[in-house]
Amino acid sequence: MKVTEEIYFYPWESYTQNNCNSILISGEVKALVDRGHKAPFPQLAAQLKKDGVDPHQLDLIINTHSHPDHFEASQDLAQHGVRVAMHPEGEEYLRKMGPMFSRATGQDAPQIQIDLHLVEGELELGSKKILIYHTPGHSPGSVCLYLPAEKVLISGDLIFAQGVGRFDFPGGSGAELKKSIERMSELDVEVVLPGHGGIISGRDMVERNFSLIREFYFPMLE
């Protein structure tokens, strides 16, 4: 699904399609956000090719966090020379907690080198500027990506349409999740692309979604 001229959204539609939403940031430098599990990746690869992108020619994989359902398949593209990025606390979590987390979900822990640490601040993809925000709560190394020119927020598993990310996994924190959500609510956003579920589109809908989260979810995050 084309969101803007250079942003494409690939929703999680079924377990044979993928297991999380993936986002392509196109342009001079091509980055795929959250590749998901490796088993269903051929379906996502086919969609990318329809949009004119060879997955093996991507420049960067950006991981919003290091839970297997968003990150696992990154290792396959890395073997083709695609660089892999995540927050340094995400890498630490991957090394220390990743094997246990993967075993608990019946998977093998990915063995992969992280080429780029996503620290808070500006990330340049060619002429495109992305602001990286460290947004812990769902996991210690979670990040959100904000594209100010397009007013697009890529929220990972921080917020969804009428929902928030789980905070009961190892390293999760309801209090940190709440702080991170409040930070993101202050941005000038017209489109939210979450890690699961549908797009939140339109400034009014984005603001209403944050209001709903404050009313119904914040009391549980104390």
Language model segments and positions:
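Metallo-beta-lactamase
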Residues: 30, 37-39, 100, 129-221
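Short polar/acidic secondary-structure junctions
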Residues: 14-15, 123, 136-137
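Short, charged, surface-exposed secondary-structure boundary motifs
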Residues: 19, 94-98, 163
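Short Pro/Gly-enriched beta-strand edge/turn motifs at strand-loop
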Residues: 3-8, 101-105, 127-128
